[in-house]
Amino acid sequence: MPLSRSLSVSSLPGLEDWEDEFDPENAVLFEVAWEVANKVGGIYTVLQTKAKVTGDEWGDNYYLVGPYTEQGVRTQVELLEPPTPELKRTLDSMNSKGCKVYFGRWLIEGGPLVVLLDVGASAWALERWKGELWDTCNIGVPWYDREANDAVLFGFLTTWFLGEFLAQNEEKPYVVAHFHEWLAGVGLCLCRARRLPVATIFTTHATLLGRYLCAGAVDFYNNLENFNVDKEAGERQIYHRYCMERAAAHCAHVFTTVSQITAIEAQHLLKRKPDIVTPNGLNVKKFSAMHEFQNLHAQSKARIQEFVRGHFYGHLDFNLDKTLYFFIAGRYEFSNKGADVFLEALARLNYLLRVNGSEQTVVAFFIMPARTNNFNVETLKGQAVRKQLWDTANTVKEKFGRKLYESLLVGSLPDMNKMLDKEDFTMMKRAIFATQRQSFPPVCTHNMLDDSSDPILTTIRRIGLFNSSADRVKVIFHPEFLSSTSPLLPVDYEEFVRGCHLGVFPSYYEPWGYTPAECTVMGIPSISTNLSGFGCFMEEHIADPSAYGIYILDRRFRSLDDSCSQLTSFLYSFCQQSRRQRIIQRNRTERLSDLLDWKYLGRYYMSARHMALAKAFPDHFTYEPHEVDATQGYRYPRPASVPPSPSLSRHSSPHQSEDEEEPRDGPLGEDSERYDEEEEAAKDRRNIRAPEWPRRASSSSSTGGSKRSNSVDTGPSSSLSTPTEPLSPTSSLGEERN
């Protein structure tokens, strides 16, 4: 049956209801970032997933500008000839003057056009450009900081390209240049210094100083007003980088951040209040069947179980059907990503499960790339033993089946004592002997280069989670990105996430947080914090996040010990859920995916571009932001199946398929009633109504969006236009609509 999704977020609060699409015929958008076709971090995901939505809006007038890397071009880019004579003349002019500029199509969804600048080929001009940067912006870059030097080269090449492109056009187009992060920020500063007619936007996905300060175990968010930013940046030897970032934020026509929590941070550290908050989204896959993602979960979980069977050979004394898989993934920042809190909570969870005699087992995965030199021999041996046991079992099964077939064929019952011969028993005994081992299953799947000082391994030694038989919580540290070609765990990241039961991301510093967002889109419950952009976004858009499988951990107003206790409580309550309750919760989690779709969140970027055009070209574009009436906002209400707690929810159909559910005695009660997921989804869609947006009538007043000044404007002014305050989804939310 087709999956009908809620239209609850077809219009987000604080953004104008555009009735007329913006006409980009004489406007060109360049999106500049170091991670264009060059995977380094999360910005790559932002650009990759947003490309289709932006391309649909701008068409062939949308270009991405990034650095040329041989690996990236070979695997991700199809080199092409420039499609317009102006662009071809621009590239030819730059190449004739000693630069190397490439043009092509990024082979991702949407297929955006890309301009790639070879920074290495322009190193001959580095010292001259660094001198010009000092004369123009008073920013000095030390010779030893290669990343900052690359940023200088990339910035000057970007400015050169934009200036040359404008010069080659007889009819000057309206150019919007959107720069992401400090590595691209030098180009923005130079565009303004050279007075290029370009509307500029700067988006910071995380502040440099914020990341360094949070890693230093300081009470960051409660002391934002007290930091001496110049002193702190200087002590960490990143003052020149900080100056690049701050200069870009102040030079931009429009300054944006990815979350409200980062907006507060940027206001204090970069000394400019963001004009608008642009949350990160994802491309949401629409499932054709109601329970398709549940089937994918079961298939992926089976792949993980195969790995667990091999990893814990000889100590597989727990029931895999009563085993939950938790995971944390991301950049290896032990404190910033909350790995310290997660480990402490796992130790406490292990104690609770043991003293309460729980039959539930938890396997916690840490997917964080670290320095290794090879696979752990014991881990490889475990997978080899598992495969050998499987081959042995298949051999015995074939011989048994053949003898049984021959016996039945002649019309006699087989003699079970003769079905297996001595050779078969010897083979099976050898297989059993191969599973014997004296040591505990390894905690780490690889050999670490810094085993004695590694933060995760050091903490595991302190809390004593060694994967012993008595432990109900097992820990597996996989210090490498997941790959479907791995000899250990041959699954890619998406398949691994689908197979797990819970993602745990108790980050202290997380400007947005793509990992919990990806969990939500895949229908996997997750734990986030009120210090992450994703956690704040969901907390402010959902009346009861935990009912939808979004657990928000308080790390801002609680001590570290209290946060650990709260996380332990979340984990323990999740372990107490039955399979039926987890199915219901996953259904609810997956229904939130529309809230994270670029189809809706892309409108924040649209609003930022309109604002930049109005500021850069005030004679041709107008933009009048209006305050938002709180009554126009909305929040996802509690699920229609009241009460919202999964522990009290009714059965998920079909009831007979829940073989793990405990038998119940007595007459049917409320908890034993049939739970119809399709019916509950329909109730949610009725309850989660889109707000009624006022229609705009024609008038001579200017609109709240950026339009040509000679276009017919509308009135009365919509109360849903972008406010002057930093636009977060939180700033205009009303109460829950019933």
For each of these PLM feature ranges, what is it?
Residues 1-738:
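Catalytic cores of nucleotide-sugar-dependent glycosyltransferases that transfer UDP/GDP/TDP-activated
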